[in-house]
């Protein structure tokens, strides 16, 4: 890989569902290993990488609320699911020699370090992949919002959203074969059209901090490196 990367520091957001692979629940280790290899390729380009992973493959807090339970407790359970996923990705990274660390928004010192903005940026300056677990540490906020928040805190050049499809569409392309795919949008267009890429709080936070959002398929081998070199198929959300 000789192409010059377009970004020096990025925040990668991956859904928990991506880790399931073809399974209906949990973690497919082969998928975690493939994502780890994509991150290794990004590091080989000299790009500093932070990661936020959702927890939907294990638990969703809204599932508790939808059945009459306590949303706060449900969200706390979801935060713990993100820690499990983060530890799985760290394991996959370590297997291939990529130095990484998990920083949790919820203190659990026997398992991983607690998040601080200063420590996170210090680790990234050292070349470590930093995996941010525990969401924002607060209920009622999605891991998309956590990704936008961490991207702002580490001064990321871009927020990359690895999804099930190769960009943003006017409708779900799996349900609507006539859905239109966008190459480029502004943050305002995403918000005004209500396009399903990230929740509105995440898009608004990225917009306020002038962070472009790049949506691509996380299932393409080497896709992350291609995106970083400006070669991949994606949708870019930017006001510039």
UniProtKB/Swiss-Prot annotation:
Where does the UniProt entry say this protein principally localizes? cytoplasm
Which InterPro entries does this one have? AceGlu_kinase-like_sf, Asp/Glu/Uridylate_kinase, Uridylate_kinase, Uridylate_kinase_bac
Looking up NCBIfam families in the UniProt record yields:
pyrH_bact (TIGR02075)
Pathway per the UniProt entry: Pyrimidine metabolism; CTP biosynthesis via de novo pathway; UDP from UMP (UMPK route): step 1/1
> What sort of enzyme, by top EC class, is this?
transferase
Q: Where is this region: Involved in allosteric activation by GTP?
A: 21-26
Q: Which GO terms describe its biological process?
A: 'de novo' CTP biosynthetic process; UDP biosynthetic process
Catalytic activity annotated for this protein? UMP + ATP = UDP + ADP
| Activity regulation summary | Allosterically activated by GTP. Inhibited by UTP.
- In terms of superkingdom, the source organism counts as Bacteria
Q: What does this protein do?
A: Catalyzes the reversible phosphorylation of UMP to UDP.
Record note on quaternary structure: Homohexamer.
User: What is the name of this protein?
Assistant: Uridylate kinase
Enzyme Commission (EC) number: 2.7.4.22
A Pfam family of the record is AA_kinase
UniProt: UMP binding residues:
55, 75, 136-143
One example GO MF annotation: UMP kinase activity
One GO cellular component term, please give it: cytosol
Keywords associated with the record: Allosteric enzyme, ATP-binding, Cytoplasm, Kinase, Nucleotide-binding, Pyrimidine biosynthesis, Transferase
Enumerate the residues binding ATP.
Answer: 13-16, 56, 60, 163-164, 169, 172
UniProt lists the family membership as follows: Belongs to the UMP kinase family.
Q: Do you know which CDD domains this protein is assigned to?
A: AAK_UMPK-PyrH-Ec
Per UniProt, subcellular location reads as: Cytoplasm
